[in-house]
């Protein structure tokens, strides 16, 4: 079993090592490790420390197609959850439900569909989903997004530097902060300034992404948003 120290050092970030080697030596990253250790020991967080970096373990950066960065606190057992990949059918997740509604409208003409709430099928297709805060307070308060700002900015800047043709979806004011790091000429950007149900349901990005992938790479590279893989 991976222990706390290994997790904080980024065991689940192994696939992303080429982007993080020097970053791990910064004072910021050292402080981030202490923050995670102390938060875990004092039970400040509402999610397991072993799952903080889970999205990075699930997505191979060399296969990356889409980055969705959101700041809506995902609901897990009545408390805000830092990211989406470890959601399950028996936990309410308001944002996943809203995104699901949007995809049903775009691809299923509003009909209900079978939906993988864990979003593992998306991860396998190169869709990385991050929250502006990878940890949230066990009290349900939005306290930590500033702690994660430099980490998320580093990830985005490294992706922009190393890859072109990535589709970046920003959902919420805090997430749009990272838009300034994107070179729109070589990537694609989609914004939802207020990720409320109505605005996201009418959000056409998922269909637009597939349209551009079809034009650039062919049908076999399109994201299957609606079905299990």
What are these regions (language model features)?
Residues 11, 18-167, 174-177, 182-184, ...:
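A polyanion-binding, active-site-adjacent surface
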Residues 1-10, 17:
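Charged boundary/loop elements
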């Amino acid at each position: 079993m991976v222990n706390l120290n290994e997790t904080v050092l980024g065991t689940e970030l192994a696939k992303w090592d080429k982007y993080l080697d020097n970053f791990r030596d910064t004072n910021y990253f050292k402080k981030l490790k202490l923050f995670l250790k102390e938060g875990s020991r004092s039970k400040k967080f509402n999610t397991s420390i072993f799952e903080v970096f889970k999205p990075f373990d699930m997505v191979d950066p060399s296969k990356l197609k889409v980055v969705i960065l959101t700041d809506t606190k995902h609901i897990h057992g009545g408390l805000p959850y830092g990211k989406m990949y470890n959601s399950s059918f028996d936990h309410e997740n308001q944002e996943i439900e809203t995104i699901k509604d949007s995809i049903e409208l775009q691809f299923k003409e509003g009909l209900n569909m079978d939906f993988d709430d864990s979003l593992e099928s998306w991860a396998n297709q190169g869709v990385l989903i991050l929250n502006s805060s990878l940890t949230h307070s066990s009290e349900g308060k939005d306290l930590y997004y500033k702690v994660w700002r430099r980490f998320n900015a580093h990830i985005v800047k490294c992706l922009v530097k190393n890859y072109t043709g990535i589709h970046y979806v920003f959902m919420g004011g805090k997430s749009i902060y990272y838009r300034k790091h994107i070179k729109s000429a070589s990537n694609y950007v989609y914004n939802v300034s207020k990720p409320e149900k109505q605005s996201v349901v009418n959000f056409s990005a998922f269909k637009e992404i597939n349209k551009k992938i079809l034009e650039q790479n062919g049908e076999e590279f399109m994201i299957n948003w609606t079905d299990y893989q």
